[in-house]
């Protein structure tokens, strides 16, 4: 299926000039109260990457922007583009991800995914792949047949792929051989073959773990959440990604603490 934001952008139909209205398709990543009734929101958009916007009166109980300016809200946002900021005029929300927010654990995972997308995305940059990944991942959280821990592993690894800092799981990092890959080395950022594994410290992987990582890295976004794994495989995936993120991202995500409760 197509993503809901693959259709023609309306940005040029309203205006692309500063000081006029623009329509951007995106998702609310975070919000912050401003004054008594206003909000400042961070949006990840198809057209302009990450943007910050102000929503006047969005905290009033009768405001049409109350629900539209909440985390996870996805849709089209019509905004006035000023010299240094955007101001939300109205929004047409196509998905609030309400099913996700009805489950506390799913909500915690969702906020972690939003925070990671916020960390990796930039303003005035093409972030469509991150937006697509985020949308697909939140949809997966609403699927009770997929373990949330597996969804997290898939999301983290694919985010690394999009940002070009993913491990090499297709050949040995020391000799380049593509056969008999047995150990994963965080230090080497990838796999080691049987011959080289004796010279380096690594994690001995089950074949299913290697296949899962290869699938996640090479698959299109729409195919990511189409498989499950055993508990043993899942634990190794978690071990690998935890160590890899610690070394190559080295950022503390505040929402991650709630996933350990």
Predicted regions and their residues:
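Non-catalytic alpha-helical scaffolds and adjoining flexible linkers that form interface surfaces
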Residues: 2-261
């Amino acid at each position: 299926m197509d993503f809901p934001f693959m259709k023609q952008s309306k940005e040029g139909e309203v205006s692309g000039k500063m000081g006029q209205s623009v329509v951007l398709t995106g998702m609310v990543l975070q919000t912050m109260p401003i004054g008594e009734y206003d909000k400042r929101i961070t949006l990840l958009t198809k057209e302009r990457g990450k943007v910050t916007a102000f929503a006047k009166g969005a905290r009033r109980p009768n405001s049409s922007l109350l629900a539209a300016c909440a985390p996870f809200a996805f849709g089209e946002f019509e905004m006035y583009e000023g010299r240094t900021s955007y101001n939300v005029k109205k929004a047409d929300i196509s998905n609030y991800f309400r099913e996700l927010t009805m489950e506390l654990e799913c909500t915690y995972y969702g906020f972690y995914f939003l925070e990671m997308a916020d960390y990796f995305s930039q303003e005035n940059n093409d972030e469509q792949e991150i937006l697509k990944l985020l949308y697909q991942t939140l949809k997966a959280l609403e699927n009770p047949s997929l373990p949330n821990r597996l969804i997290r592993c898939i999301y983290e690894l694919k985010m690394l792929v999009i940002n070009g800092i993913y491990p090499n799981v297709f050949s040995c990092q020391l000799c380049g051989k593509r056969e008999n890959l047995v150990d994963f080395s965080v230090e080497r950022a990838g796999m080691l073959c049987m011959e080289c594994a004796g010279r380096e410290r690594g994690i001995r992987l089950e074949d299913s773990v290697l296949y899962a990582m290869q699938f996640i890295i090479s698959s299109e976004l729409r195919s990511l959440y189409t498989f499950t794994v055993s508990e043993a495989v899942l634990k190794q995936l978690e071990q690998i990604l935890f160590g890899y993120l610690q070394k190559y991202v080295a950022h503390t995500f505040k929402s991650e603490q709630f996933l350990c409760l």
